[in-house]
Structure formats: structure tokens, C-alpha cells
Curated annotation (Swiss-Prot):
The chain crosses the membrane at residues 3-23, 38-58. NCBIfam families: bac_cardiolipin. It comes from Salmonella typhimurium (strain LT2 / SGSC1412 / ATCC 700720). The gene is clsA. The active site is at H224, K226, D231, H404, K406, D411. Residues 219-246, 399-426 form the PLD phosphodiesterase domain. This is Cardiolipin synthase A. The lineage of its organism: Bacteria, Pseudomonadati, Pseudomonadota, Gammaproteobacteria, Enterobacterales. GO terms for molecular function: cardiolipin synthase activity.
Length: 486
């Protein structure tokens, strides 16, 4: 009996070290960023069982076998559709401004199409204005409505949007709604999901959370896009979820969420439509390619329109493109660079680019919320402040609520707005969308919004920052070490 237990003990020990060695080898062979690899190895060797389970759950990008097969299967038809779109040469911009030229070339070569011109674009910064405009457009819809949101929280004006969408479905408009399973858990637990389906709306719970499949697909891979397309001509995107700020997370202690949305008319809706069709096919297996370009692209005034490129990121889309786009935009800055984001945990490359821009004389400002709904990200963000301040970057802490806007403005002409936070999750994991706009008029509108944010912010004083308590510095460094995993 003693011999038996001895053999079992040695087998357990051997299996333990084989498992650790196997996971270690897998981490090293994945060619991931060094800080990320080191953070994972530290967790695994300090807390082996916890670390191994965590790594197998969220350490690698698993879309899931069925979704991965759908993603591969959809690309031949999607590629053909994109080639057909290229035949509509009149919608594509032939030239871009000097500050935007490199970024637009990058997007064209990586995504296969150039930026589209002739779009009408309006910035909306008030949640009531966004929802009222959306309700009007839904009421005027003639053919189809497609929506995707990370969060749909019942209550307030969000219910009015839901009512208008159900009314549209009842009068024969083809309505599709895709919501992230984790972000919209309150919606799927409410009567609204059944009510919408009964009204004729196709409601899809994207990336459904299932603990039984935790090792087969990353549960923290989320559908983070916020998009609305109406009649293949009107489109919305930006940072705002389908929530009424007066009813959303009121117990979080951060104030109302402050967002920005863009309402567009023109060919950009077609580009966003193909992104939505890919998401829909990956999730449901059903192919819903937008109508042929020559059918849905309506006349437009080229002289007064905006040139826009759409960047889609996430599994199945060009890898690392949004990260490359942010780096390219940052290095293109010559006069000033303004960034707004609720969550700031940049890659080493992006941090270096921002600091380098400030050190070569660019006026660099980053606007962050003073209070954050994520304790982990809040502390991790602070770990970067010293390096930014030393480089000459201005850090503004917004005091008017939780600033949720994701925007970048370069030299008043090149703008990026969308759903991407400046953190690892948005840059390399989630399904996201970003608009790249080459236009001084839109740049002026975005600058006015950012100036308003600055007027409601407090500039971080570098002299006071270095005097913060020791315990805060220790906490910041702790979270900084694990920032590659956040």
C-alpha cells in the first residue's frame, strides 16, 4: 500500500510539472508581447493551478470551433462583394491630406478598399439627441434596420427606441438586433427580448456566456461594437451603448456616462454594412450581404462630403490593424494630438509613440475620467502617468461624469472615433469599429467637443503627482505589472 501511494504521489508531481512545462512552452511559442508573456509566467509559477486555469480560459484567442469555421467560410463571398464594391470608383477618395495619407494607405492595403468620400456626418454628444435622432430615422425606415450594441439596458429613452423598433418590424421593416451576451445580460433577463422577437425582430445573443465551454472559447472575448444601419444609407457609431445615462449604473459612484456618436449618410453605411454582415454570419451562420453597391449608393455632393475609412477589428478581421492605425496617427502628428478614452492601458509601442510625439514638440493631451467604473483599470492607468508627464504630455482628469468617448484628433484634420478604448482588450481582443475621418470641418467639430471636455477637467500637476503617497505608488506598480492581461 505504501508503494502504491508513493507511485501515485510521484505521478501527481510528474503530471503537475509536465502541465506547467507544457503551458510554459505554449506561452513561449505563441510569440506574444514580452510583458504579456512575463505576466502570465509569473502568475503560473506563483499560483500554478489558478494561473493555468486562467491561461487556458482567457490566455489565448479562441473564437470557438463553430464560429471559426464560419469566419473562414464567409471570406470568399465577402471578398467577391468587396471586389464588386471596388467597381464603384466614384465613391472612393483618390487623394488624402498629408497628415492622413499614410493611415489611409495602411487601411486600404490591409483591408482591400480605399476610404469612401461624399458622406454627410454629424456629431451628437447628448444622449437624448442621439436617441431622438435614432427614433426619427427608425420611423422613416423603408427597408431594413440592423443594430449591434455591447450593452442594451432597459429603462428611460432606451425603451422608446425599443418601441419604435418594434413598430417598424410590425409595419414590415426587416429588423435585426445583435447584443453581446455579457454586456446585455439585463436585457436578456427582461421581457424585452421576447417582446421584440414576438414583434418580428431577429434578436441574437452574441458570444453567449456558457461556463461549460469556458476552455473552448474565451469568455472575455466580447462583441463591443455599437452600430446602427438603416436602409443601407444611414449609419450610426461611436462610444454610446443603448442606455439612458440617467438610469445606467447610478450606484457606481462615477456620475453619468458621457458619450459621443456620429450619424452618417452616404457610402460609409455600405462599408459598415459588410462589417455587420460578417458579424451576423459568424454568430448565426446566415449570410446577409448588403445589397449591391450600385443599388444602395445614392447621389451625394462630393464637394461637401467627408472622406471616411472604416476599421473593423476582432477575430477574423485584419490582425493588429487598429493598433497600427493608432501608431500611424500618433507618428503623423506635427502640431497637436488629443486623445480621449475611459480606459488607458496602452501597449509599450503606443506609450512610446505618445511620449515621442510630445518630446518632438507636438502638443499632446490625454483626457481621462477622474473616476472610473473599473478599479483595476483605474489603478493600472495611473501607472503610466509619471512617464507621460515626464515626456511633456498633458493629462486632463474629467470631472463631469464617466467620460466614455473614444476619440483621437491629429492636427485638426485627421480624426478617429468609434468604440476602441486605449487598452489591451480593445486593441487586440474584442470586436470593435473605428471611423477614420480626413476632414478639417469634422476636425473642428471634434475639437470643440474635446475643448468642452477639457473645460470640465482638472489638469494633472506633475509637481503634486510626484508627492503622492507610497502606498499608491506600490499599488500602481502592482497593477502595471499585470496591465498586459487587463
Amino acid at each position: 500500500m505504501t508503494t502504491f501511494y508513493t507511485v501515485v504521489s510521484w505521478l501527481v508531481i510528474l503530471g503537475y510539472w509536465v502541465l506547467i512545462a507544457g503551458v510554459t512552452l505554449r506561452i513561449l511559442m505563441k510569440r506574444r508581447a514580452v510583458p504579456s508573456a512575463m505576466a502570465w509566467l509569473l502568475i503560473i509559477y506563483i499560483l500554478p493551478l489558478v494561473g493555468i486555469i486562467a491561461y487556458l480560459s482567457v490566455g489565448e484567442l479562441h473564437l470557438g470551433k463553430r464560429r471559426a469555421e464560419r469566419a473562414r467560410a464567409m471570406w470568399p463571398s465577402t471578398a467577391k462583394w468587396l471586389n464588386d464594391l471596388k467597381a464603384c470608383k466614384h465613391i472612393f477618395a483618390q487623394e488624402n491630406s498629408s497628415v492622413a495619407s499614410s493611415l489611409f494607405k495602411l487601411c486600404e492595403r490591409r483591408q482591400g478598399i480605399a476610404g469612401v468620400k461624399g458622406n454627410q456626418l454629424q456629431l451628437l454628444t447628448d444622449s437624448d439627441d442621439v436617441m431622438q435622432a435614432l427614433i426619427r430615422d427608425i420611423q422613416l425606415a423603408r427597408h431594413n434596420i440592423e443594430m449591434v450594441f455591447y450593452i442594451w439596458q432597459p429603462g428611460g429613452m432606451a425603451d422608446q427606441v425599443a418601441e419604435s423598433l418594434m413598430a417598424a418590424a410590425r409595419r414590415g421593416i426587416h429588423c435585426r438586433l445583435m447584443l453581446d451576451s455579457a454586456g446585455s445580460v439585463a436585457f436578456f433577463r427582461s421581457p424585452w427580448a421576447a417582446m421584440m422577437r414576438n414583434a418580428g425582430i431577429e434578436v441574437v445573443e452574441a458570444l453567449k456566456v456558457n461556463l461549460m465551454r469556458v476552455f473552448l472559447r474565451r469568455m472575455d472575448l466580447r462583441q463591443h461594437r455599437k452600430m446602427v444601419m438603416i436602409d443601407n444609407y444611414i449609419a450610426y457609431t461611436g462610444s454610446m451603448n443603448m442606455v439612458d445615462p440617467r438610469f445606467f449604473k447610478q450606484d457606481a459612484g462615477v456620475g453619468q456616462w458621457v458619450d459621443l456618436m456620429a450619424r452618417m449618410e452616404g457610402p460609409v453605411a455600405t462599408a459598415m454594412g459588410i462589417v455587420y454582415s460578417c458579424d451576423w454570419e459568424i454568430e448565426t451562420g446566415k449570410r446577409i450581404l448588403p445589397p449591391p453597391p450600385d443599388v444602395n449608393i445614392m447621389p451625394f455632393e462630393q464637394a461637401s462630403g467627408h472622406t471616411i475609412h472604416t476599421i473593423a477589428s476582432g477575430p477574423g478581421f485584419p490582425e493588429d490593424l487598429i493598433h497600427q492605425a493608432l501608431l500611424t496617427a500618433t507618428y503623423a502628428a506635427r502640431e497637436y494630438l488629443i486623445m480621449t478614452t475611459p480606459y488607458f492601458v496602452p501597449s509599450d509601442d503606443l506609450l512610446h509613440a505618445i511620449c515621442t510625439a510630445a518630446q518632438r514638440g507636438v502638443d499632446v493631451s490625454i483626457i481621462l475620467p477622474r473616476k472610473n467604473d473599473s478599479l483595476l483599470v483605474g489603478w493600472a492607468s495611473r501607472a503610466f502617468f509619471s512617464e507621460l508627464l515626464a515626456a511633456g504630455v498633458k493629462i486632463y482628469q474629467f470631472e463631469g461624469g464617466l467620460l466614455h468617448t473614444k476619440s483621437v484628433l491629429v492636427d485638426g484634420e485627421l480624426s478617429l472615433v468609434g468604440t476602441v478604448n486605449l487598452d489591451m482588450r480593445s486593441l487586440w481582443l474584442n470586436f470593435e469599429i473605428t471611423l477614420v475621418i480626413d476632414d478639417t470641418g469634422f476636425g473642428a467639430d471634434l475639437a470643440a467637443v474635446q475643448d468642452d471636455y477639457i473645460s470640465r477637467s482638472r489638469l494633472l500637476d506633475a509637481r503634486l503627482w510626484v508627492k503622492r503617497p507610497l502606498w499608491q505608488r506600490i499599488t500602481e506598480r502592482l497593477f502595471y505589472f499585470f496591465s498586459p492581461l487587463l
